Amino acid sequence: MSSKGIQKKTKAVDATKKLAEKIKKQALKQKALASASSAASTKESLPVSETISISTSETPVSDVSELSNKEDLSTKKDQSSASSSSSTSSSSSPPSVQSFTEFDLVPELLESIQSLKYTQPTPIQAAAIPHALQGKDIVGIAETGSGKTAAFAIPILQTLYTAAQPYYALVLAPTRELAFQIKETFDALGSSMGLRSVCIIGGMSMMEQARDLMRKPHVIIATPGRLIDHLEHTKGFSLKKLQYLVMDEVDRMIDLDYAKAIDQILKQIPSHQRITYLYTATMSREIEKFKRSLNSPVQVEIVKLEKVPDKLKQTMCLTSPNTKDTRLIQIVNLDSMKRVIIFTRTVVHTRRCCLMLLNLGFKCVELHGQMPQSRRLGAINKFKAGTPILVATDVAARGLDIPAVDLVINYDIPDPTLYIHRVGRTARAGKAGKAISLVTQYDLESYLRIENTLGTKLPKEDLPLDEMQGLQVSVDRALSKAIQMLRNEENDNKLRHRGRSNNK
């Protein structure tokens, strides 16, 4: 090896050592930061009429699989021991609900529940439905897959049966996929009741959706942005007589910058007559603000003990931003026969990584929130059919029917909750799986929070330095080409937009 090559190798090793030292130094600092953050969030909490907290270590069941496969839920869940505490510090156990028949539901709704093989209510359903049937506002803190969709759909359908009217209920969801899943749940549960529902999401025809709205559906499931489009432009459409409002996965809606859109929607819905359900996986200051739109809500919290799959091997790879893409290719090359999901933080990173991989000859597809619905479904179907690599934003981290995955790569480091959702895409159903996280000096705080949550230090992935240096030139070339392709695409879009403006 030449003297220049030795110098390069020495510098890279030194940089890795320095990065490892930084991680050690910031560990104590990060623990203090986590404690301070926890204390601050406690101070921000608003009073509620009652709080019910249920601890469970069960693995949640996907709402979609519950409907599409009609599996017997009793084989998937055992209700854990529960405890509840009210705002006056008294405590009692919530009633043990063994069957949906105990809710005194109308026969038509019970018939649908039984046909779906729903037997014993999940913890969130057992805790929330009785209060919802009494007409109380609900704040539900539970993960996707806990059965929360049925927890708010069943009370709405119960009251709708006795007082049916158009535009009776509105469900706001952060993504198109979740909106479709919620509609499936409502349609299945309301199949014996003549329910009319409509899904109002971006990427679909505004005109067709306007026609659907004019048919006076009972339940509207919508993403916030597209709903505002119809409130502003669809004649005769109004939410002034709305009886129920559901804000599902509010934490994700805030992450997707829908806070202002939700505020705008709330201003158009009479607060004095509506019942509101707010569901979220986490609680934050922003979500506390939305709680103010509820009337003395009952707060139901399912405290799930977050954990990664038992047969998951987790490692981390220390890298610099300049060598991050080369390290990614090294990892993908470890076993080209594996099914891989590469998670990124942004749409730009997803597109750039996918193009780079394609330029290097890999077969892959991308998945992100800016794709039309047809393309998103197409990407998932290609991955299911055998395309080995899926590059995706966190739209693929939860709530989607993604097949068995061998390897998850965290190209960008997420927060601890999203990390658990991401790596949970592998090592499923008792199978082994692996997750590797690429960590730069800019990711230290986020990475340490993950280790804190896991309660363990992740071992380093041993990737040969010589191999990385051998790949660097070809990866840099493929990356430059990908960046240029994105620039050309952006310029073409600008020209098309300018042409449309000139033709008006």
Swiss-Prot record:
Basic and acidic residues bias locations: 68-79
Helicase ATP-binding domain segment(s): 129-301
Annotated motif Q motif, positions: 98-126
Domain Helicase C-terminal: 327-471
Binding-site positions, ATP: 142-149
GO-annotated biological processes: maturation of SSU-rRNA from tricistronic rRNA transcript (SSU-rRNA, 5.8S rRNA, LSU-rRNA)
Entry keyword Hydrolase: yes
EC number(s) from the headed UniProt entry: 3.6.4.13
Catalytic activity: ATP + H2O = ADP + phosphate + H(+)
Broad EC category: hydrolase
Chain residue ranges for the region called Disordered: 34-99
Keywords attached to this entry: ATP-binding, Helicase, Hydrolase, Nucleotide-binding, Nucleus, Ribosome biogenesis, RNA-binding, rRNA processing
Subcellular location: Nucleus
CDD domains recorded: SF2_C_DEAD
Main localization, broad class: nucleus
Gene Ontology terms, MF aspect: ATP binding; ATP hydrolysis activity; RNA binding; RNA helicase activity
Domain comment as written in the entry: The Q motif is unique to and characteristic of the DEAD box family of RNA helicases and controls ATP binding and hydrolysis.
PANTHER family: ATP-DEPENDENT RNA HELICASE (PTHR47959:SF24), ATP-DEPENDENT RNA HELICASE RHLE-RELATED (PTHR47959)
Known function: ATP-dependent rRNA helicase required for pre-ribosomal RNA processing. Involved in the maturation of the 35S-pre-rRNA and to its cleavage to mature 18S rRNA.
Subunit description: Interacts with the SSU processome.
Protein name: ATP-dependent rRNA helicase RRP3
Encoding gene, per UniProt annotation: RRP3
